[in-house]
A protein has these predicted regions:
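Bacterial N-terminal signal peptides
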Residues: 7-17
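Extracytoplasmic metal-acquisition and chelation regions
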Residues: 20-209
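Positively charged n-region of N-terminal signal peptides that target proteins for export
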Residues: 1-4
């Protein structure tokens, strides 16, 4: 259990360091990217740096399974340059088609592309019982994180090709941090038990790795 505690601390530290490695977006920037959840915002900010203001549809502390966007958020979405989705989370299953219909000009990018997906479990939302065929918690894995940041990089280059070298440099830095974190976790787990219990099944990808 002690090994698992330190390992989870390493994961949290990785996400925190990723979010802190890029300048916080300032209010009033003209270029906005909307993402679904906070972990994806952290990754996107790490690659986008000061070129885009990144905002989350699901606020910190809210459930991505049950959250409904506010009218103000729906209006603000129309001002975004793009929408980055995490892929298979409850909010997106409920809302993504409606968001696309309401903003036909807005490009949507799926950051789960090329991620080796795992079978999920049944989650209950406020509207339906969604039997998730896919576990949506893809960000809780350093191996997946490498794929996610590459997807973000490619999307940003499509949106803003003039700054491709800038994004490539930041991608290299973030990838190095991810790999360093992976090495630290492997060291911590070398002699640890390989079985653990968790209340919410959010670490399936981590357990696989």
């Amino acid at each position: 259990m002690k090994h698992l505690y330190f390992l989870l601390t390493a994961i949290i530290g990785f996400i925190f360091n990723t979010s802190c490695s890029s300048p916080k977006a300032e209010t009033g920037k003209s270029s906005i990217i909307t993402v679904t959840i906070e972990p994806l915002r952290y990754f996107t900010e790490a690659i986008a740096g000061d070129k885009f203001d990144v905002v989350s549809m699901v606020p910190d502390g809210s459930s991505p399974e049950t959250y409904d966007p506010t009218p103000q958020q729906l209006v603000a979405l129309a001002q975004s340059q793009a929408y980055f989705q995490i892929g298979h989370i409850g909010f997106e299953q409920t809302w993504i088609q409606r968001l696309q219909a309401n903003t036909p000009h807005l490009p949507f990018y799926d950051m789960s592309e090329n991620v080796p997906l795992m079978e999920g479990t049944c989650h209950e939302t406020h509207q339906h019982n969604h039997d998730h065929d896919v576990d949506p918690h893809i960000w809780n894995s350093t191996k997946n994180a490498e794929i996610i940041v590459k997807n973000i990089y490619h999307a940003l280059c499509q949106l803003d090709s003039i700054h491709q070298a800038y994004y490539a440099h930041r991608l290299d830095s973030v990838t190095a941090l991810i790999r360093e974190t992976e090495q630290q976790m492997q060291t911590l787990m070398k002699d640890a038990d390989r079985t653990f219990l968790i209340y919410h099944p959010a670490l399936t990808y981590f357990a696989r790795d």
